[in-house]
Swiss-Prot record:
This is Argininosuccinate lyase. GO terms for cellular component: cytosol. GO terms for molecular function: argininosuccinate lyase activity. Belongs to the lyase 1 family. Argininosuccinate lyase subfamily. It comes from Rhodopseudomonas palustris (strain BisB18).
């Protein structure tokens, strides 16, 4: 005869392989806090509705508090034979308070129980990631303010395009992180409905109060359809999608740090705190923190893809396939959180080389667009014509092996006679960035204003709690 809590209709014990594939405690033990909180809310509701006695509910709550303390202290004995966190908690509760523990599962199934636990877990995770992203934004905006005037090359196709400031470049990632935070917050709003009380799939005949348990657990409302409540994993998928986009943003910046710190580029240096050495090459300083932050993206995207594939063919309602929803997601959320912290640390740590940045910003005829703009503005030339003229001037400078501002005025006038000495004034990288005063542009005064506004906004968020 089976000794499982669900084993009443079984006459044989499960095969060892069945037990091995069925067990989930190694993963869902991380839901212990959420499982205990949901059980306490459920017990209180059962008592309020007269389904269990107040005495039993009190003993259940006391026993659950004891279990929580044991788990936090590391003294709780998790048993793989009990399969999951729910049965481990219930078994220990039975040891502590006796038969009253068996009343806790009235009007509840593991189906709505695990759905509730995981929603609470993902909600807590979102709050933690949001706080980490806010710290990352603060680090970026702080350094952007410091380097609002530090000129560097802006790139398209990884070719020098136009001069920008280092502060402007950093502020781009502040904006990306803001959208990431918005996506996480949107996901949080949609997940914040309670499955508890949906039971196995059809609801329950007991006179439960789902609004009460939803409120007790901080949910906005109970989920409206019991089938949906136990079978939905949209909330994990949506959060993983937000995490994947955030990870891609981090990966793009991490890649830039790897490039910038290369001796071939040399625009930025990381301290020993965020680099490692080589076991054979004593001179090496490898940007491993950036490389690993970049690599974490694969784990996050992989978790999203994996769960999409798990869910794509599942009919309503709960299927055991859904047990595979947690490990990949938990690992992905942990990887993202670590990558955010690592990137925040590197942002605060990195030391730009303004001289090298300025030199690089002037290479590749990066101020050619400024000359074209001058032709449009001063000579009233159509932009397409100005583009063509400037292209010919760049070609001549390249042919002579000189920078654009080093090309003699006479050589420019041979291509366009109306060009004057004034045109040369727009060809410095400093004048180029200062001229980009349009909203969202790289002008230092814009960058300072944006960085200050973000720092003020983040401080207000922090103070409002």
């Amino acid at each position: 005869m089976s000794n499982k809590m669900w084993g009443g209709r079984f006459s044989e014990r499960p095969d060892a392989i069945m037990e091995e594939i069925n067990v989930s405690i190694d993963v869902d033990r991380h839901l212990y806090a959420q499982d205990i909180a949901a059980s306490k809310a459920h017990a209180a509701m059962l008592a309020a509705q007269g389904i269990v006695t107040a005495k039993d509910a009190k003993n259940i709550a006391k026993g659950l508090d004891t279990i929580l303390s044991e788990i936090v202290a590391g003294s709780f004995d998790f048993k793989r034979a009990l399969e999951d966190i729910h049965m481990n908690v219930e078994s220990r509760l039975s040891e502590l308070i006796g038969p009253a523990a068996g009343r806790l599962h009235t009007a509840r199934s593991r189906n709505d129980q695990v759905a509730t636990d995981f929603r609470l877990f993902v909600r807590d995770t979102i709050d933690g990631i949001d706080a980490a992203l806010a710290s990352y934004q603060h680090a970026l905006a702080t350094r952007a303010l410091e380097h609002a005037d530090t000129v560097m090359p802006g790139f398209t196709h990884l070719q020098t395009a136009q001069p920008v400031t280092f502060g402007h470049h950093l502020m781009a990632y502040v904006e990306m992180a803001a959208r990431d935070r918005g996506r996480f917050r949107d996901a949080r709003k949609r997940l914040n409905e309670s499955p508890l009380g949906a039971a196995a799939l059809a609801g329950t005949s007991f006179p439960i109060d789902r609004d009460a348990t939803a409120k007790a657990l901080g949910f906005e409302r109970p989920m409206a359809n019991s089938l949906d409540a136990v079978s939905d994993r949209d909330f994990v998928l949506e959060t993983l999608a937000a995490a994947s986009i955030a990870a891609v943003h981090l990966s793009r910046f991490a890649e830039e740090i790897v490039l910038w710190t290369s001796p071939l580029v040399g625009m930025v240096r990381l301290s020993d705190k965020f680099t490692t050495g080589s076991s054979i090459m004593p001179q090496k300083r490898n940007p491993d923190a950036a490389e690993l932050a970049r690599a974490k993206t694969g784990r996050v995207i992989g978790a999203l893809t994996g769960l999409l594939i798990v869910m794509k063919g599942l009919p309503l309602a709960y299927q055991k396939d859904m047990q595979e929803d947690k490990q990949g997601a938990m690992e992905a959320f942990a990887a993202l959180s670590l990558a955010i912290r690592a990137m925040s640390g590197m942002v605060s740590d990195l030391v730009p080389d303004p001289a090298r940045m300025k030199q690089a910003a002037g290479e590749g005829y990066a101020t050619a667009t400024d000359l074209a703009d001058w032709l449009v503005r001063e000579l009233k030339m159509p932009f397409r014509d100005a583009h063509h003229v400037t292209g010919r001037i760049v070609g001549e400078a390249s042919k002579q092996g000189v920078a654009l501002h080093e090309l003699p005025l006479a050589e420019m006038q041979a291509i366009e006679p109306r060009i004057t000495q004034q045109a040369l004034s727009v060809l410095s990288v400093e004048s180029s960035v200062k001229s980009r005063v349009s909203y969202g542009g790289t002008a230092p005064k814009n960058v300072r204003a944006q960085a200050k506004a973000w720092l003020k906004r983040l401080e207000k968020e922090h103070n409002s709690g």
